Amino acid sequence: MLQRLEQLQMQTSNILKELHSTSIFTDSTTSQLHNGGENSVMDTEESSAIDKLSASLQQVNISSPSVPTSQSRVTQGQSLGNTQISNPTSKTNNVRAKARNIRNPSQRLRPSTSLARLSNNAPRIPKEASLHENSISSKESPSVTTSKHVATITKPSTSSIARMSSNARIAAIPRAKSSMAVRSPSRLGNGPNVRSPKVGFNAKSDDSPVVKSPGSNDKPSASPRISVRSLGNSSVVRPPTRTSTTRPLSRVNVTNASGSISKNSTSPSKVKVNASTKIVRPVSAAQTVRPGSRIFRENSASNTQRPNVSATSNSTVRVASSLAVRPVSRNAQARTPSRLEQREVNVKNSSAKIVRPGTSLGVRSPSRIQSTLSSRTTTGNVRTKAANIVRPSSSINRRPPSSINQRPPSNLRILAPSRSRATIHERPSSSILHRHAHSLTSSSFSTKTLATTKEIQNSPTLVESSTVVHHDPSYLQNQTSEINDTNHSSHSSPLDLNRMI
């Protein structure tokens, strides 16, 4: 196929030499009729050249019986032109008119450009070279190439552009190597720095020369990077457009408030970088299961007032997060610990203390009872009559005096005065109360012992013994002496009970 194209080019060059040697002005009048008198000399030369070209191409078509597909389009277009010019004396005017109608100014500009390309390397023509102009119209190919300076038929403009693109690809390879000298292409990603295939793909559109200074065609952000990298310095801090990639140097400046900065920090170099900088995290992100060195290294830097933070192990951090109680935050200098954090310490330290809602009053009450009892009994008002029988039931269970009076007096068991003098002076009431404080709150008071306690008016030791009678029911049940005196059992009036309650 290339040999066939070379033969056609040789024949056209011979025809052009004949055209330049002979001057033909025979059909000037008819060309002025068709063209309006503007380009009469050009049209007469073109019309006469069409006749000679068609005659020479008809001889070539007879000598080549089997031609490939790209060549067959050329021969089809030439054969259509040949059938019209087979009788040259009668149909030359029709051929001129049709060839003139096909042409437009953009196609008239092409032969002058294709001449310079032919002079460089004429025999090297790609396979799909002749497809471009012959697909425009079947009769165009004889007429386009027949001005004064044209030397080819099947040399379209795409072949030179294809050759320019092949040259551009060759020239783009050392440029790509020079710009990628430090970084391998796998580390590039799809950032703004990938510019080596851009020259090869887009070179068909612009015919500008390719080899230039290294960063002139590209974005202005690329040129200082190339100049630095050409010095062989690989430790270059990247500009801040590259902060989205997973480099440890670029991740230092990113203070991420959502805690996602700990996702990518797996390599030890990133852990070192993050540990040296102070990153304020939320509380939940700091409690994830991580090696404890990085968390507590920040604590020792930020919390200088609390030296025992670094001593806490990793398991306590996990327990605090699993209890759904907010743990101590990482910058604890600024605020006092909240109420949840104070309760969290109690939950960690005592595992046996299970607070149920029914007995929540029983858990808190011993300290209150002890404080009220110690404040009332240790004052100097102990020996006054009705104000010193301390009963928690007065604040918890208020009962009317009618229910107290319904009890029979035989159920009362009070210490005898002789027993109480011996025991109470040996151990005072405050130690007894302190001893039996927990048994008071955990055991339910029987209303029998609560309600039927009477005021004893005789001696101050009996006043103290009445407190022992009330607050120690287990001690009362062991006593065998029953008081049946009418002084203590029968003469207590409802007024005294009302004063007591």
From Swiss-Prot:
UniProt entry tagged with the keyword Cytoplasm: yes
Cellular component, GO annotation: astral microtubule; cytoplasmic microtubule; extrinsic component of mitochondrial outer membrane; microtubule cytoskeleton
Biased composition (Polar residues): 61-95, 103-122, 132-168, 253-274, 367-381, 478-495
One record GO biological process: intracellular distribution of mitochondria
Main localization category: cytoplasm
Disordered: annotated span: 61-274, 328-381, 478-501
Domain of life: Eukaryota
Residue spans of biased composition, Low complexity class: 234-252
Entry keyword annotation includes Zinc-finger: no
Disruption phenotype: Leads to mitochondria aggregation and segregation defects.
Keywords annotated in UniProt: Cytoplasm, Cytoskeleton, Meiosis, Microtubule
MF terms in GO: microtubule binding
Subcellular location: Cytoplasm, Cytoskeleton
Function: Involved in the cell polarity process and in regulation of microtubule growth. Has a role in meiosis. Involved in microtubule dynamics. Binds to mitochondria and microtubules, attaching the tubular mitochondria to the microtubule lattice at multiple discrete interaction sites.
Protein name: Microtubule-associated protein mmb1
Name of encoding gene: mmb1
